[in-house]
Amino acid sequence: QFISKPDLDPFALTKFHGHNAIHYCLGLEAKERGMTFMHQAGEDAELMTWAKEAFVDEVVVGLRNEFNNFKDDIFTEDGFTAYAEDALERMVNPYLRDPIDRVTRDPIRKLGWDDRVVGSIRFAMNAGINPEKMISSARKGLNEIMIAQSFQNRTDALNLVWQEIPSFQELESVRELILNTNQDCEKV
């Protein structure tokens, strides 16, 4: 059955900043553990708990705050939780044989200001939470850029990623949060 929706943007952004962000972050975490395919992550209960917590406690909180006036069952707490659980199950489907290298490729794009990971971090910060797991993954992505570009620090890597973005307060707050391991987030 086809259900028409008058506004698809919240659904598209939820897929991008929810599913796509966590897929990338889960891939980075799995790669760090020596895994080569996403279904291997599904066999690691601790890693899947990490992914569900990142999705539900960080990404979903930010998305619910962003779309708090949008009326649809998926945008409720239960709806988002069900969405997250379903998405995680699909991410680690063994029949896909999804290579982690494919999932984690192009960190420069995936850590872009308006892209999946940083966009999710921004939504979470705007909801007043510190998205520690997402930030940890962003740092891992920056580490990959450092290696690929022979940079000495994450600041240089982040400068490369965000070179086209003019500086403003929100950007500086997010930059500081990602680069400083001891700082809590503040609502921006």
Regions found by a protein language model. Give the residues of each.
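Substrate/ligand-engaging "lid" and interaction regions
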Residues: 1-188
